[in-house]
């Protein structure tokens, strides 16, 4: 690879980086409105940066929700979650922001997010955020 080609490659965003930069939560119409059911999504590779040290924080996100009028599209939530990888944000703020954004986009009947962060310095943090009232399924 020539020096010019190498320079161009480092300046041109990769297709995955472009997709993450353009990420937004996309929802589609609930195929079974009026029926109580739950959707469970696990995102095991979440990363963001500690706002105090700048070190990366890693977590498993576990989302359980009961759809309202809309259901979140899976690729969209994957890209949306990946958009946090370079953001400096606390565990508590990122967990609440994700819930706020999901509620704004999909209007679920009930939603719970569990953000299970990898231990660092002998401290293990789990943040749980809920919205709405869970209905029996």
From Swiss-Prot:
<protein>
    <recommendedName>
        <fullName>NADPH-dependent 7-cyano-7-deazaguanine reductase</fullName>
        <ecNumber>1.7.1.13</ecNumber>
    </recommendedName>
</protein>
<dbReference type="InterPro" id="IPR029500">
    <property type="entry name" value="QueF"/>
</dbReference>
<feature type="active site" description="Thioimide intermediate">
    <location>
        <position position="50"/>
    </location>
</feature>
<feature type="binding site">
    <location>
        <begin position="91"/>
        <end position="92"/>
    </location>
    <ligand>
        <name>substrate</name>
    </ligand>
</feature>
<keyword id="KW-0521">NADP</keyword>
<dbReference type="GO" id="GO:0033739">
    <property type="term" value="F:preQ1 synthase activity"/>
</dbReference>
<dbReference type="GO" id="GO:0005737">
    <property type="term" value="C:cytoplasm"/>
</dbReference>
<comment type="function">
    <text>Catalyzes the NADPH-dependent reduction of 7-cyano-7-deazaguanine (preQ0) to 7-aminomethyl-7-deazaguanine (preQ1).</text>
</comment>
<feature type="active site" description="Proton donor">
    <location>
        <position position="57"/>
    </location>
</feature>
<keyword id="KW-0963">Cytoplasm</keyword>
<feature type="binding site">
    <location>
        <begin position="72"/>
        <end position="74"/>
    </location>
    <ligand>
        <name>substrate</name>
    </ligand>
</feature>
<dbReference type="Pfam" id="PF14489">
    <property type="entry name" value="QueF"/>
</dbReference>
<keyword id="KW-0671">Queuosine biosynthesis</keyword>
<keyword id="KW-0560">Oxidoreductase</keyword>
<dbReference type="GO" id="GO:0008616">
    <property type="term" value="P:queuosine biosynthetic process"/>
</dbReference>
<dbReference type="InterPro" id="IPR043133">
    <property type="entry name" value="GTP-CH-I_C/QueF"/>
</dbReference>
<dbReference type="InterPro" id="IPR016856">
    <property type="entry name" value="QueF_type1"/>
</dbReference>
<dbReference type="GO" id="GO:0006400">
    <property type="term" value="P:tRNA modification"/>
</dbReference>
<comment type="pathway">
    <text>tRNA modification; tRNA-queuosine biosynthesis.</text>
</comment>
<comment type="similarity">
    <text>Belongs to the GTP cyclohydrolase I family. QueF type 1 subfamily.</text>
</comment>
<dbReference type="InterPro" id="IPR050084">
    <property type="entry name" value="NADPH_dep_7-cyano-7-deazaG_red"/>
</dbReference>
